[in-house]
Amino acid sequence: MGDAADGAVESALVFAGSQASAYLIGAVSAGIIVLVLVLWVFSALGSYIGYGGFKARRRNNRIEVEYGLLQHTFQGIDIDRVQSVVVKQSFIRRLLGYCELSLGKIDAATGEDSSNKQNTLANQGIIIHPFVKMNRVPEILAGLVPEFSDLPQQAKPVAKVALRRAVLRQSIWFGGGFWLAVVVTVCLVVFGWVNGEVATGGIELDSEDLFLLSIGWNVIVVGGYALAAVLFIVDIVNAVLWARESSFAYNHRFMQVSNGGLSRETVSFPRQKIQFGCTKSNPLQRRAGTDTLLATTAAGSGGTTTTLIDASHADAMAWLDWLKPGGNQ
């Protein structure tokens, strides 16, 4: 009778722990959603205050911008120092059809006593529009930097095998969801061992400890696997979008590199601004017939390298020929 009573108590505690875990998981999930929404609202409000009253103009050979409601900021740059045009779309901007338009520029090295804000401005270049419709980008470039009006149009997509490689790279090798599932599985094994020891009497736990153990078990297993599944799906979607949208293009004057995904960035720069260009490949890429393109300009305080992974080997070799002196003729 005593063993039966103890078993009944243990079963009741496990059931109560399961119910408490379900409520706890629901509360935590709701809290995370609310927190994300609140952070997004504060981020949008901060951007509005930071870029309120934004103005951009072209004055002879200089591009000037000014913005800020609480702290007014003025930036100017000579057109000769402009190294690239950068179109950035965060996930939210992509959903809305908007982008951030900026210019990569040459910056002097910053000293140790420079402020963090100055370093950030140097790294991101000069923003010529913080929030603009994608279909207005050509119009703005024609008005502010007409020197960049002859951008290449015929894009060369990444190799077909890049989709498979991107899915493996982003969802497995560097996938947050996959490795979170591995960690949860290890925790599950540990909890299973502890539970087995408790059942055989190897580890003695009172009713309160057993209750807490049951809650922890359910939270980690259910919540961990659920989060891992969501992250895994996000990684796969990001990889598929990257493979579909990533490309590079060049003509007699310019090169353009696009890296897609849930967020997207397109960088365009003149051929004469490329200080160094090369291709590289690892053994897996050589087996797949792909190369990584790297083009370095003087943008920023120490130069900026734009990279595209898994271009086809034939396209990469043609691009190297274009980089050679006279290769754009």
How would you describe each model-predicted region?
Residues 1-329:
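N-terminal basic, Ser/Thr-rich segments that initiate or prime the first beta/alpha elements at protein or domain
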